[in-house]
């Protein structure tokens, strides 16, 4: 994509987010697309998380040990409404997890087993009571961090907030 197209898309996204009350900050643009683009877009520097999102991020940070097995986890981030900063009290906490190659299914098994005792991970059957449960939206191996070019993936990656190993964001 050419620079002009990227700047145009960033500006469209900024306008969309401002209409829903969640502005896009120049630091987000710089982190995702690079510092050269944050200078080229007219920004409203108001990318604050609402109180519910802050509480849910704090809850994940306190529970992080439940998701770190055998030093194989490379990255954990929050996506969805919490990552975007407009979470509601009844929302779950969407997770984006990257693990070492050849460890994804073993990791998933450990998550399932640990959930038998804690019940903190949202299951498909959990339709009504999802408040503060962790929804593992994506578990990827390092070699598999390639996404379809669609609006869902764009939104998930755009508002991804690192919680564990922030330096890994440059690989995503």
Language-model regions, residue ranges each:
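Catalytic core of pol beta-like nucleotidyltransferases
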Residues: 2-90, 99-172
């Amino acid at each position: 994509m050419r620079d002009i197209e990227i700047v145009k898309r960033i500006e469209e996204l900024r306008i969309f987010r401002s209409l829903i009350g969640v502005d896009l900050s120049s630091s987000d643009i710089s982190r995702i697309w690079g510092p050269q683009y944050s200078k080229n877009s007219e920004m409203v520097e108001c990318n604050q998380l609402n109180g519910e999102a802050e509480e849910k991020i704090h809850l994940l940070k306190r529970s992080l040990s439940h998701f770190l097995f055998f030093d194989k986890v490379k990255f954990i981030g929050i996506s969805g409404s919490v990552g975007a900063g407009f979470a509601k009290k009844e929302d779950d906490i969407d997770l984006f997890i990257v693990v070492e190659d050849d460890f994804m299914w073993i990791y998933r098994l450990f998550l399932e087993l640990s959930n038998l005792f804690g019940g903190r991970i949202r299951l498909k059957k959990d339709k009504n009571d999802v408040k503060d449960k962790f929804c593992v939206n994506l578990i990827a191996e390092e070699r598999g961090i390639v996404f379809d070019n669609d609006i869902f993936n764009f939104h998930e990656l755009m508002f991804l907030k690192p919680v564990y190993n922030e330096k890994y964001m440059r690989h995503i």
